[in-house]
């Protein structure tokens, strides 16, 4: 979770809450649980559905289109970092049309309250509802209301200033908005402003109070249409009590008309989603310092105190379903301190010490296994991309049919393609075997030849693991394979093989594979997994149809042993200083071809203004050149970026355009426009640029989603190029992935939250019941000295938790003492 700007995050020295939205498909290697499925009735016989995911009014993701299906499976997973004022999550299911506009099948909307009602989140089928234009509202309106009295009675003065980010109702992507104010039986209207979603009225409407009971104030926004009825854009309403005690003054979110009953949409199908919202109050760094120091002491302390350390107690209190999240946060926390190696060595030492059978080493989902797995994903993702991406891309592009299992062979496939006779089962097997080895050969060549490219931190972690296993199992019968299996079990079974099986989850591809390619990837992943197991399970009764591959697999095993020997042949001096980040600032986090345009090039026709450029983004620069091989590059320092936002389609009559607003040394703002191929690429670039520029000061709170053309802004129609931005920026909305920066405070907060869950158990088990000493000693074999150290560690943990409790209570007290929540900010 990234920190928002200090000006919005901190309140009297304490920060506001941060939020993280997780969409989790429950994926396991070799198995995907159905996450999103829509089942519309067979109207035309088939559909080409895809799903849009929106946070409030911002599209954050688009799934792949599943062609010719009434029951598609997407299996998409998204982690979204949210702004503080997040209100709603929506899923729109659409039918893609190659000609004309895509048809909306239906949608589901989940309010923030609905998601947080159950701490476990939502995991269920939800019926799609019809998309009602009167309910599809967005944006905000700025009002200032006064209640006045004179000799003729009471008067309501409503100053309608402006609105922003209204829903587009016209085919041009804009609207013709006007406001209508109701008070009692009276109503007045503002003027209509044509072709804008960001109207500025600055009009004052006065209404006299009529006899009778006090009336609420309602302000409606409408899109004026010359032909047909006007389109509803949204409304706000204020009770008589609010008008009397605290007249509205500021920005207010537009709401739809209340509906008598919700459309169940039973005939539209249903969507299955799994959503979890994590909202944490993240305190200043000094509040977490005692907790962090306790965890560091656990890692740096003597080995004989492993079982009595605070980190050991944390491991005991963590349930299986929480271990992955905790492992990720702990790895990041220790990475930021340069202690990832000692942390992994500590967990490895404990795991190896309690393992009796070397064949079961690291096979469970223990904290040690999960931490090493997350460490590889965090530190080794660029390495994984370098090794596997070329061959994965080749498999996707060539779309070869491969099958060894006779029960799954489609012998008529070749005949349908080539109009020749169907091949025999043996011919199909030989052809598939040649294709599989043709892919596996380069994959294994890339892996065994990648020693020099493997991150030094990973090599040191594997060396420590290698040493601990040799010390625990020194007998000759163990030495042959155990020292290799411990490493290959992580590197091959938990890293390479899962990445081959599901490339999208490892950012190797933008979309999931089609069924045929997915089967090819499964066969390749099975082969790599067998090699990672050093061929120990070959020919043991399972999947005997893989036997034709056995000679290749056994030949590769000897190469893997040599590769692992070279991989762990590294020392601290060669590895350099301990890693304190996921990757160096100069590392490329995203690259690819985009269309680039500078702001308003004079005398150049607009359709020629966008030029194809190859773009690199690192933590330091955003660079452009004509091609990847081109030596001349133009670069923008990431530290100069002040906003990264979408651009309305109507600005250039082009879709998927974003803007990067930078500030030079003289304080002048400059805008670079970039066009992406599709909405997913747009979201990925937006997210990457926002995360890279997150630490920058002086971020813009608002900018223009249009372009300055023909002496005015296309969005708000203002004539001054220097006019203040008309739309709020969305710097807090980013997609979570492997390139997320370290955030020590948020990671420490997660550890604190996990300890809170086990605090009562900790008190009962190690502090409050002195009669448990004898039973605990009998169960664990621990001596009284160990029990005393455990009790002391628990006491220190509970003391730290109490201090953090008081800090959080102080924050909550400040929240309670705040004036009632006011209108939306600028």
How should these model regions be labeled?
Residues 40-42, 49-51, 78-80, 173, ...:
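Polybasic phosphoinositide-binding surfaces of eukaryotic membrane-targeting domains
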Residues 1-36, 42, 117-120, 124-151, ...:
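Long, low-complexity intrinsically disordered regulatory regions
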Residues 1-73, 79-178, 182, 579-581:
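Acidic, S/T/P/G-rich intrinsically disordered/coiled linkers that flank
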Residues 1, 33-43, 61-70, 124-130, ...:
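The phosphoinositide-binding surface of pleckstrin homology
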Residues 1, 51, 58, 75-112, ...:
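Eukaryotic beta-sheet cores, primarily in C2 and C2-like/PH beta-sandwich modules
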Residues 48-52, 59-60, 66, 70, ...:
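Conserved tryptophan-centered aromatic signature that marks the ligand-binding surface of SH3
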Residues 53, 111-123, 133-135, 181, ...:
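Pleckstrin homology
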Residues 2-3, 130-132, 214, 235-611, ...:
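Extended alpha-helical scaffold/tether regions of large eukaryotic proteins
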């Amino acid at each position: 979770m990234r920190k928002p700007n200090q000006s919005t995050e901190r309140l009297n020295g304490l920060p506001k809450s941060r939020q993280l939205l997780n969409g989790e498909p429950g994926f396991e290697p070799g198995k995907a649980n159905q996450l999103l499925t829509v089942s519309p009735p067979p109207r035309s016989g088939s559909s080409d559905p895809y799903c849009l995911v929106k946070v409030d009014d911002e599209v954050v993701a688009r799934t792949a289109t599943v062609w010719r299906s009434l029951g598609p499976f997407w299996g998409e997973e998204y982690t979204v970092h949210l702004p503080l004022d997040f209100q709603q999550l929506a899923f729109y299911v659409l039918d893609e049309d190659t000609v004309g506009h895509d048809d909306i099948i239906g949608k589901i909307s989940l309010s923030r309250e609905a998601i947080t009602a159950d701490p476990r989140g939502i995991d269920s089928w939800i019926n799609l509802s019809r998309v009602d234009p009167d309910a599809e509202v967005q944006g905000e309106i700025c009002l200032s209301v006064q209640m006045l009295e004179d000799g003729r009675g009471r008067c309501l003065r409503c100053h309608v200033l402006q609105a922003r980010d209204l829903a587009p109702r016209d085919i041009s992507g804009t609207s013709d908005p006007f406001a209508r104010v109701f008070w009692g039986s009276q109503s007045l209207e503002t003027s209509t402003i044509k072709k804008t979603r960001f109207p500025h009225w600055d009009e004052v409407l006065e209404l006299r109070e009529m006899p009778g009971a006090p009336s609420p104030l309602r302000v409606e926004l409408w899109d004026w249409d010359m032909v047909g009825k006007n389109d509803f854009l949204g409304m706000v309403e204020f009770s008589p009590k609010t008008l009397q005690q605290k007249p509205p003054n500021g920005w207010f979110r537009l709401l739809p008309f209340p509906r008598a009953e919700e459309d169940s949409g039973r005939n539209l199908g249903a969507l299955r989603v799994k959503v979890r919202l994590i909202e944490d109050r993240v305190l200043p760094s000094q509040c977490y310092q005692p907790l962090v120091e306790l965890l560091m002491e656990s890692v740096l302390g003597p080995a004989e105190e492993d079982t009595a350390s605070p980190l050991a107690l944390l491991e005991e209190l963590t349930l299986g379903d929480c271990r992955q999240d905790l492992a990720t946060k702990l790895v990041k926390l220790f990475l930021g301190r340069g202690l990832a190696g000692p942390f992994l060595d500590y967990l490895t030492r404990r795991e190896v010490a309690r393992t009796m059978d070397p064949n079961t080493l690291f096979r469970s989902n223990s904290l040690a296994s999960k931490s090493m797995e997350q460490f590889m994903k965090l530190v080794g993702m660029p390495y994984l991309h370098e090794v596997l991406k070329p061959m994965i891309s080749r498999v996707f592009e060539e779309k070869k049919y491969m099958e060894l299992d006779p029960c799954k062979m489609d012998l008529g496939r070749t005949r349908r393609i080539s109009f020749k006779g169907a091949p025999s089962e043996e011919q199909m097997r030989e052809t598939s075997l040649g294709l599989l080895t043709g892919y596996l050969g380069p994959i294994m060549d890339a892996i065994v030849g990648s020693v020099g490219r493997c991150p030094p931190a990973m090599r040191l972690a594997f060396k420590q693991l290698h040493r601990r296993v040799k010390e625990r199992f020194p007998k000759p019968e163990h030495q042959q394979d155990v020292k290799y299996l411990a490493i290959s079990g992580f590197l091959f079974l938990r890293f390479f093989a899962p990445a081959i099986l599901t490339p999208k989850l490892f950012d190797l591809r933008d979309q999931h594979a089609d069924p045929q390619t997915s089967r090819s990837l499964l066969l390749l992943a099975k082969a790599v997994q067998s090699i990672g197991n050093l061929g120990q399970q070959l020919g043991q009764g399972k999947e005997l149809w893989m036997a034709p591959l056995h000679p290749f697999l056994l030949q590769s095993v000897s190469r893997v042993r040599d590769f692992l020997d070279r991989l762990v042949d590294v020392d601290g001096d060669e590895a350099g200083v301990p890693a304190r980040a996921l990757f160096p600032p100069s590392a490329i986090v995203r690259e690819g071809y985009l269309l680039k345009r500078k702001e308003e090039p004079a005398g150049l026709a607009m359709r020629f203004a966008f030029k194809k450029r190859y773009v690199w983004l690192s933590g330091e620069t955003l660079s452009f050149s004509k091609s990847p091989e081109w030596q001349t590059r133009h670069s923008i320092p990431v530290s100069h970026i002040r906003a990264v936002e979408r651009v309305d389609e109507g600005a250039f009559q082009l879709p998927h355009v974003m803007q990067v607003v930078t500030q030079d040394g003289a304080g002048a703002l400059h805008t670079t426009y970039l066009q992406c191929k599709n909405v997913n690429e747009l979201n990925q670039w937006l997210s990457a640029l926002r995360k890279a520029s997150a630490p920058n000061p002086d971020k813009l709170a608002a900018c223009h989603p249009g372009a300055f053309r023909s002496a005015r802004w296309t969005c708000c129609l203002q004539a001054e190029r220097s006019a203040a931005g008309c739309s709020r920026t969305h710097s807090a909305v980013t997609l979570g992935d492997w390139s997320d920066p370290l955030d020590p405070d948020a990671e420490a907060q997660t550890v604190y939250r996990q300890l809170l869950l086990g605090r009562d158990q900790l008190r009962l088990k190690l502090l409050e019941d002195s009669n448990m000493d004898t039973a605990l000693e009998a169960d664990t074999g621990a001596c009284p000295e160990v029990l005393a150290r455990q009790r002391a560690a628990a006491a220190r943990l509970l003391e730290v938790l109490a201090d953090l409790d008081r800090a959080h209570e102080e924050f909550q007290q400040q929240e309670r003492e705040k004036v009632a929540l006011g209108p939306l900010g600028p």
